[in-house]
Amino acid sequence: MRPSRRAPDELRAVSLERGVVKYAEGSCMVKFGDTHVLVTATLEERLPPWLKGQGRGWVTAEYGMLPRATLERTRREASAGKQGGRTVEIQRLIGRSLRAAVDLEALGERQITVDCDVIQADGGTRTASITGAWVALADCIGWMKARNMIKTSVLRDNVAAVSCGIYNGTPVLDLDYAEDSEADTDANFVMTGDGRIIEVQGTAEKTPFSQDEFLALLALAKKGVARLVDLQKMAVA
């Protein structure tokens, strides 16, 4: 039995609310159960120096957690003077994931910066961030289309992410913190709307896992991502 009493293939309650920030070109409040992330997408008419003059744009991301997003206060990274390794890893993952779904040439010589701020963390902050980031990105691109800044399709596909793991010997979908902290194995899957894989991160926390167990996790992830993509489509409709 899962602590949340969910079925092995059941997502947490997921919501994606678009257009929640007044000033941002795109925004989304994403909730995976008790994990809540505020995502904004900002259009900038500038590029990294190494991209200038190449006729294509860029999508990048930043990620952070509020001090009391967790059970005990976490010191702000700004006050420590540098970002932690986990933060850098996650924001690079978010950026890579979004770029996989964007036609950067159609975007033109512009940059979209996606900011993911974790308000409350209960496991799966990176997967929630990616799923909400796609909605904020789509919101931003819609803003651009409405102003005739782009004429062709920029988004090639949806992108969503979900965690899976082996908890008490059973493959389960969308781990919360109680499960993640006790799981034998946990993995994050980032996938497109048509089921292609962008990235997989998997770790045996206690005991190594078999190929059959990995395939079971992959099957769960495909099911979970398909449901998340449906929710994304409803959010941006």
UniProtKB/Swiss-Prot annotation:
InterPro entries noted in UniProt: ExoRNase_PH_dom1 (IPR001247), ExoRNase_PH_dom2 (IPR015847), ExoRNase_PH_dom2_sf (IPR036345), PNPase/RNase_PH_dom_sf (IPR027408), Ribosomal_Su5_D2-typ_SF (IPR020568), RNase_PH (IPR050080), RNase_PH_bac-type (IPR002381), RNase_PH_CS (IPR018336)
Enzyme category, top tier: transferase
Database matches in CDD domains: RNase_PH_bact (cd11362)
Keyword line: Nucleotidyltransferase, RNA-binding, rRNA processing, Transferase, tRNA processing, tRNA-binding
Single biological process term from Gene Ontology: rRNA catabolic process
Binding-site list for phosphate: 86, 124-126
An MF annotation (GO) of this entry: 3'-5'-RNA exonuclease activity
Subunit structure: Homohexameric ring arranged as a trimer of dimers.
Protein name, per record: Ribonuclease PH
Organism name: Nitrobacter hamburgensis (strain DSM 10229 / NCIMB 13809 / X14)
Underlying gene: rph
